[in-house]
């Protein structure tokens, strides 16, 4: 028992030895100024970083100077920032207005990150002096209106982010939208959507037609006048596929004929093979109207009064075989309208007021190059001097060296170079050729 007691006493003495130094440790922690070693210097470094004299980090990475001033509750640009900065990170601050000449002294700036601030106004010369700026991030702010004029001073701008802003899509945005839709600006303003008016909410800026925003008729539709009578009007959607008839046999068909539609329905079932939109009031085809209907093979758009087809309207219709555009108001096709129709076989073009000038050349040469596409109805309606001519005849005369007054006189009964007759003959014989089979047996 004595031996056990001695051992316990010895253990207690050993355990009490470290506690003797603890008061000194506590004193050194309570007064860090007494510490002159490396540990003391490390402890003071965070204080220097967030000192009022230098609220932001300036560093060099891959030989390019950066200013990192994110999450500092800034409301303006500080005057003591270096002028030779190449990249400026100002995200997640409290900036509300970008004033004229705000960044004028940073002439070497390449990228400017202003996302997740509270920006609601950008003055016309806010980016003055930024001749070398290539990247500008303005997403997640409160911007409603902006014009092309603000970007006059950024000729090298190639990457612009504008999404998650409550864009007010009216005539004030016309110049900005026109700038974003220039083909070379394919990385400017992607994913930005309208926040108002309600009729255009969630519509991408790149899908809008700038001229529509300033059209008086469109304004009346977006901002209707209050009703005089107390009876509420029945609101019917302009484009709702539930108004159409869906047939499964013999093929998946959506019949939207004579439904008073003004736009292509946005909720077309993706497995539809045949779509009939004839005899409606669709005046133009917007970009990517049919991008979700991948299986579509037959599309009827006749008798709508279509005046314009966007070059990206048929994007995604790689399986389309038949397209009926007859009895509309088409005068020509913009370059690129037919580029995605790889397997097109039949194209109806009759009863359109085709205008024979240089703009018709794209359609003619596309058909000439895609000789497997059978078409009809490509006849000049205007100008008067070419009325009744086939478009092919007009294009050939366009490149003749003789002046117009020396061209041979064509009788008015000229039969369109027999293009339509040849098409009908080929179309008539086509089913018979499809059933011919040649079998070769190799011994």
UniProtKB/Swiss-Prot annotation:
Alphabetized InterPro entries for the sequence: Cys-rich_flank_reg_C, Leu-rich_rpt, Leu-rich_rpt_typical-subtyp, LRR_dom_sf, LRR_TM_domain-containing
Annotated spans, Disordered: 20-48
Biological process per Gene Ontology, one example term: ossification
UniProt protein name: Leucine-rich repeat-containing protein 17
Cellular location(s): Secreted, Extracellular space
Tissue specificity as recorded in UniProt: Expressed in osteoblasts, spleen, lung and heart.
Residues of the LRRCT domain: 165-216, 352-404
GO-annotated cellular components: extracellular space
Gene3D superfamilies cross-referenced by the UniProt entry: Ribonuclease Inhibitor
Chain's gene name: Lrrc17
Positions of LRR repeats: 84-105, 108-129, 132-153, 271-292, 295-316, 319-342
Lineage, highest ranks first: Eukaryota, Metazoa, Chordata, Craniata, Vertebrata
Keyword presence, Nuclease: no
Residues of the signal peptide: 1-15
Keyword Secreted: yes
């Amino acid at each position: 028992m004595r031996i056990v007691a001695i051992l316990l006493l010895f253990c207690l003495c050993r355990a009490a030895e470290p506690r003797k130094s603890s008061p000194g440790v506590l004193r050194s922690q309570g007064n860090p100024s007494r510490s002159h070693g490396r540990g003391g210097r490390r402890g003071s470094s965070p204080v220097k970083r967030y000192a009022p004299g230098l609220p932001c980090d300036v560093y060099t990475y891959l030989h390019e100077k950066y200013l990192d001033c994110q999450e500092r509750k800034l409301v303006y640009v500080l005057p003591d920032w270096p002028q030779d900065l190449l990249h400026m990170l100002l995200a997640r601050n409290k900036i509300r207005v970008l004033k004229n000449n705000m960044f004028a002294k940073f002439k070497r700036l390449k990228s400017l990150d202003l996302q997740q601030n509270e920006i609601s106004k950008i003055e016309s010369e806010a980016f003055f002096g930024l001749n070398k700026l290539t990247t500008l991030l303005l997403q997640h702010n409160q911007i409603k209106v902006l014009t092309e004029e603000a970007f006059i001073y950024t000729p090298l701008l190639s990457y612009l982010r504008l999404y998650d802003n409550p864009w007010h899509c009216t005539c004030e945005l016309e110049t900005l939208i026109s700038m974003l839709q220039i083909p070379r600006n394919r990385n400017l303003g992607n994913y930005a959507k309208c926040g108002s008016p309600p009729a255009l909410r969630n519509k991408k800026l790149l899908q809008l037609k700038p001229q529509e925003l300033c059209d008086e008729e469109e304004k009346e539709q977006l901002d209707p006048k209050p009703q005089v009578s107390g009876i509420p009007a029945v609101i019917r959607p302009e484009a709702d596929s539930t108004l159409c008839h869906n047939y499964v046999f013999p093929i998946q068909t959506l019949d939207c004929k004579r439904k008073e539609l003004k736009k292509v329905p946005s909720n077309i079932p993706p497995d539809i093979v045949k779509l009939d939109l004839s005899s409606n009031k669709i005046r133009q085809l917007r970009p990517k109207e049919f991008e979700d209907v991948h299986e579509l093979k037959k599309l009827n758009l006749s008798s709508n009064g279509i005046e314009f087809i966007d070059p990206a309207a048929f994007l995604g219709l790689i399986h389309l075989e038949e397209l009926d555009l007859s009895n509309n108001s088409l005068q020509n096709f913009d370059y690129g309208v037919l580029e995605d129709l790889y397997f097109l076989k039949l194209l109806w073009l009759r009863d359109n007021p085709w205008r024979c000038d240089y703009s018709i050349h794209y359609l003619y040469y596309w058909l000439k190059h895609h000789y497997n596409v059978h078409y009809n109805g490509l006849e000049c309606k205007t100008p008067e001097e070419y009325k009744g001519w086939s478009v092919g005849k007009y294009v050939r005369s366009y490149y003749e060296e003789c002046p117009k007054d020396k061209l041979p006189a064509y009788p008015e009964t000229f039969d369109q170079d027999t293009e339509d007759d040849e098409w009908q003959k080929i179309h008539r014989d086509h089913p018979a050729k499809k059933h011919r089979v040649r079998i070769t047996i190799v011994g």
